[in-house]
């Protein structure tokens, strides 16, 4: 079995690792960094940029730079979180067959496709590091991701050309990375505050077994929300003094977002920061600038309610775990947003001033844990068992719109459970089974995952037919539902895949599209490398002419200069193809080689002549020199 990579597909940043040599190793990207911004950009030239290159041009290309795509992964456009995301980003979120997607210059991309581009880059970086092709991967998701979001994440991996062996929860992966070397039995709490999601998980680690006791969280709460509070504040202050709403200008909004993120980071170590955005907009009076000081105290007052919400989730998780606060030995802080001092203070305070465990790298520990799980699946890591849980209850809609739970929140997975239901009317020929996920009492208030029908039920009075509904959750937390008419033996089953918004046919098409673009990208890369080679050749040849120009025959020099001019002219053409450039490069290369040969022969001749003269003079015993 080939190497298995572990991937933390984050809202703000992503990270990839591999288990080798008895440990999880973080794989640097080609830019030399351990994390890659989860940003994809589409340029006017048709290029697709991923990571740092995409982030660098975000301000000048806000409409076609996609960030925080994880926040709309697996969301229906009708959901409030999709609508909220639409108002916070610089790109256009649209409805595609009921699901949230993005519109880039008239072309619609699903969140799975955008995420696949990020995963593809991580895959390429891993292959460059490992030195061989990589296919198998373990990908992490927030513990509070629902079935639709999990399935969408797995689909993204498939589109990127990955065989996703396992989807595991981020806090569980973190605990795995922390506790692999642990020799003692202990209860740990993982507080995972990332860019767009928050999870808290309580685990018991005992003799290589990692058992999740409880989990809680919010898949739409994270550092992005901290940033947005600063953006709202900056915009309100500027609007108050200048009467201009900067959110109406996509470029200005992107500058606000970048400034907010930087200010948040600075306030983790400083008590005050200055936000200086010159030329943020233009009015009839001329260019306008935004200059504001922001104190940590002011920032903390903005985000206090958000951090308090995370504490409420800790309370829920602790209650469901059945443990007292004193039973928690370690509190592991995971996710870049845990660097915010207020979050650290409030978590420590909740546990009576307990010291937090900051021994793990909050940006890398999730990927490391995923890599360890990859090692477990590959057989490299022995005697480790993960016992995770389903984060939300699963059930079906029954008479009166009630959500009847079949698998309760916090049930250890994998799991399979069944219940018997019946018809609501006499001689009912079919039943529609609506699958829902959530904790609300009525189906309409929960997340709808899918709908399927069991037909040809034998005619009988209401309540007589026995219909067995079975829920089967695999180790990835992905659900399959089946129903069987006990009287006729007829059955129907579905994997809740439609909940991600993509059919198998659509996924296969996207895989092919990704392969197609890979070929295009490869061609584009070859063209860029050829242009770089051409520029270097021109520079070197011109340098040689400058240094040895008087030693080159006039005709040969003219040919070389003509070849340089022709190559420069073709490079000026932005539409020049490889086929146009290559012959010009070849011509100049051959000419420069001839020049080098002439120069070499000239030097050899000069040295030979000098040697002859020296010999002759030596023979005559004559010294030709001037002496002062």
From Swiss-Prot:
The modification Phosphothreonine is found at residue 197. InterPro entries: ATPase_NBD, Chaperone_DnaK, Heat_shock_70_CS, HSP70_C_sf, HSP70_peptide-bd_sf, Hsp_70_fam. It comes from the Bacteria. Residues 597-628 are annotated as: Disordered. Keywords: ATP-binding, Chaperone, Nucleotide-binding, Phosphoprotein, Stress response. PROSITE patterns: HSP70_1, HSP70_2. The keyword Phosphoprotein applies. SUPFAM superfamilies: Actin-like ATPase domain, Heat shock protein 70kD (HSP70), C-terminal subdomain, Heat shock protein 70kD (HSP70), peptide-binding domain. One of its GO terms (molecular function) is ATP-dependent protein folding chaperone. Induction: By stress conditions e.g. heat shock. Belongs to the heat shock protein 70 family. HAMAP family: DnaK (MF_00332). Acts as a chaperone. This is Chaperone protein DnaK.
């Amino acid at each position: 079995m080939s190497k298995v990579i572990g991937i933390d597909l984050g809202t703000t940043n992503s990270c990839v690792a591999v288990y080798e040599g008895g440990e999880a190793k973080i794989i640097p990207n080609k830019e030399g960094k351990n994390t890659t911004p989860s940003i994809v950009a589409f340029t006017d030239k048709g290029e697709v940029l991923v990571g740092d290159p995409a982030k660098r041009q975000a301000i000048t290309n806000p409409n076609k730079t996609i960030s925080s795509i994880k926040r709309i992964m697996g969301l229906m456009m009708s959901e409030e979180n999709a609508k909220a995301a639409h108002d916070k980003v610089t790109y256009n979120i649209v409805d595609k067959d009921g699901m949230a997607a993005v519109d880039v210059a008239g072309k619609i991309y699903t969140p799975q496709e955008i995420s696949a581009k990020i995963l593809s880059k991580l895959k390429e970086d891993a292959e460059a590091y490992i030195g061989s092709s990589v296919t198998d991967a373990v990908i992490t998701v927030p513990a509070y991701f629902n079935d639709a979001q999990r399935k969408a994440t797995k689909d993204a991996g498939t589109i990127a050309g990955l065989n996703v062996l396992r989807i595991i929860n981020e806090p569980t992966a973190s605990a795995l990375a922390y506790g692999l070397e642990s020799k003692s039995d202990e209860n740990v709490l993982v507080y995972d505050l990332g860019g767009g999601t928050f999870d808290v998980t309580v685990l018991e680690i005992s003799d290589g077994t990692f058992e999740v006791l409880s989990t809680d969280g919010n898949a739409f709460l994270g550092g992005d929300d901290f940033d947005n509070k600063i953006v709202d504040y900056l915009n309100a202050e500027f609007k108050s003094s200048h009467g201009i709403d900067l959110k109406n200008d996509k470029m200005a909004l992107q500058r606000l977002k970048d400034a907010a993120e930087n200010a948040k980071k600075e306030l983790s170590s400083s008590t005050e920061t200055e936000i200086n955005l010159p030329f943020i907009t233009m009015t009839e009076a001329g260019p306008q600038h935004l200059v504001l000081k922001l104190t940590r105290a002011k920032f903390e007052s903005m985000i206090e309610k958000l951090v308090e919400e995370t504490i409420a989730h800790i309370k829920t998780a602790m209650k469901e775990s059945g443990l007292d606060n004193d039973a928690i030995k370690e509190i592991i802080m995971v996710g870049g947003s845990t660097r915010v001092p207020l979050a650290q203070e409030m978590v420590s305070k909740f546990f009576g001033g307990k010291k937090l465990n900051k021994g793990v790298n909050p940006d890398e520990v999730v990927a490391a844990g995923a890599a360890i799980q990859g090692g477990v699946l590959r057989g490299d890591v022995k005697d480790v068992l993960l016992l995770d849980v389903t984060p939300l209850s699963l059930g079906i809609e029954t008479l009166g719109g009630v959500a009847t739970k079949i698998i309760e929140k916090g049930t250890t997975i994998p799991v399979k459970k069944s219940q018997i239901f019946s018809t609501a009317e006499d001689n009912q020929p079919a039943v529609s089974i609506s699958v829902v996920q959530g904790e609300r009492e009525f189906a309409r208030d929960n997340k709808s995952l899918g709908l399927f029908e069991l037909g040809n039920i034998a005619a009988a009075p209401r309540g007589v037919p026995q219909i067995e509904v079975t829920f089967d959750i695999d180790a990835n937390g992905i659900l399959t539902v089946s129903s069987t008419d006990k009287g006729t033996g007829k059955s129907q089953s579905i994997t809740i895949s439609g909940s991600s918004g993509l059919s198998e046919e659509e996924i296969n098409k996207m895989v092919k599209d990704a392969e197609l673009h890979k070929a295009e990208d490869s061609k584009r890369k070859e063209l860029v490398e050829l242009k770089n080679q051409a520029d270097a050749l021109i520079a070197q040849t011109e340098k040689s002419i400058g240094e040895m120009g008087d030693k080159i025959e006039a005709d040969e020099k003219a040919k070389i200069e003509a070849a340089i001019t022709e190559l420069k002219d073709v490079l000026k053409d932005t539409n020049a193809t490889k086929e146009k450039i290559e012959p010009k490069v070849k011509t100049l290369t051959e000419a420069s080689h001839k020049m080098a040969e002439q120069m070499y022969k000239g030097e050899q001749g000069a040295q030979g002549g000098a040697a002859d003269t020296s010999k002759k003079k030596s023979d005559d015993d004559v010294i030709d020199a001037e002496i002062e």
